[in-house]
Amino acid sequence: MQIQTIRQYLPHRYPFLLVDRVTEVTDNSIVGYKNVSINEEFLQGHFPEYPIMPGVLIVEALAQVSGVLGFIMNNETPKPGSLFLFAGAERVRFKKQVVAGDQLVLKSELVMQKRGIYKYNCTASVDGIVAATAEIMISHQKTEQA
């Protein structure tokens, strides 16, 4: 799935769209990636002499790829008034720094679904080495545009 299609699933735009491509989708899992460039705005201040991707943005990238999966799993096309929103994160662990030039591989697998809340086991890795893990929860919400 290329960026044009990802933009149909996610409301995020520059500089906050953190999924560049989706490479694999199954009934309950998704794999995508974020190419981390030295030109990222967040790297200008985190940290100027040693730029690393903030951990919270790694978690956000995992939530975004999980949101894409939420639409796909429900066989739903995104439309105004319907979003999968980041509802929470548990058991977040950061294991490796992510730096400019890295390709951050984002994996998300559904582990629970109940009343519009979805829980995913997520892993972010670089070159096959785990950079972060988290349990991500998203919620299917109707917005005021509905």
UniProtKB/Swiss-Prot annotation:
The keyword S-adenosyl-L-methionine does not apply. GO terms for biological process: fatty acid biosynthetic process; lipid A biosynthetic process. Its EC number is 4.2.1.59. InterPro entries: FabA_FabZ, FabZ, HotDog_dom_sf. GO terms for cellular component: cytoplasm; membrane. SUPFAM superfamilies: Thioesterase/thiol ester dehydrase-isomerase (SSF54637). GO terms for molecular function: (3R)-hydroxyacyl-[acyl-carrier-protein] dehydratase activity. Involved in unsaturated fatty acids biosynthesis. Catalyzes the dehydration of short chain beta-hydroxyacyl-ACPs and long chain saturated and unsaturated beta-hydroxyacyl-ACPs. PANTHER family: 3-HYDROXYACYL-[ACYL-CARRIER-PROTEIN] DEHYDRATASE (PTHR30272:SF1). The active site is at H46. It catalyses: a (3R)-hydroxyacyl-[ACP] = a (2E)-enoyl-[ACP] + H2O. Belongs to the thioester dehydratase family. FabZ subfamily. This is 3-hydroxyacyl-[acyl-carrier-protein] dehydratase FabZ. It holds the Pfam family FabA.
